[in-house]
Amino acid sequence: ISVRDTQTIDLDWGGKLVFVNSIVGGAIDARFLPAILKGIMARMEQGPLTGSYARDVRIIVYDGKMHPVDSNEISFMLAGRNAFSTAFKEAGPKILEPVYDVEVSVPADYLGDVMSDLQGRRAIIMGMNSEKGYEKLLAKVPLKEMSSYSTSLSSITGGRASFTMKFSSYEL
């Protein structure tokens, strides 16, 4: 594929879109490329998989057809939108889940119960250490599992434990 032009666009919702023009022989007039891009971006913004934004995508436009009378911007915008939807689904996209580093300070008496609760939340225990009569648990936990953790931790320990969390990564 011969690359004629490449645009890298920073997306408002994070990530990038790389748009590559590899059209040869005038199969599609260059004036319709912005309409194709607009259709693709509209579909990316709607989220073709779960309703959440698609990001970090490379699009290569290499062929197409025009009609001297019926070709217009709306037709190419819809074509870009539909082509993106089809290609996106065929690519087998994966949904990434936000995972957080969680640090729990807990009295030693409650350590087992707190560890059991964390493991029930799909936590991966990364380590432990003792500090001033408290055990410090380090774990990686999916954000989805942390919605009621404060209440649960307080209930398990009688309000004697605390925790902090910060974003770590996105994982499958």
Can you annotate each of these PLM segments?
Residues 1-172:
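Accessory interaction regions appended to the cores of large information-processing enzymes
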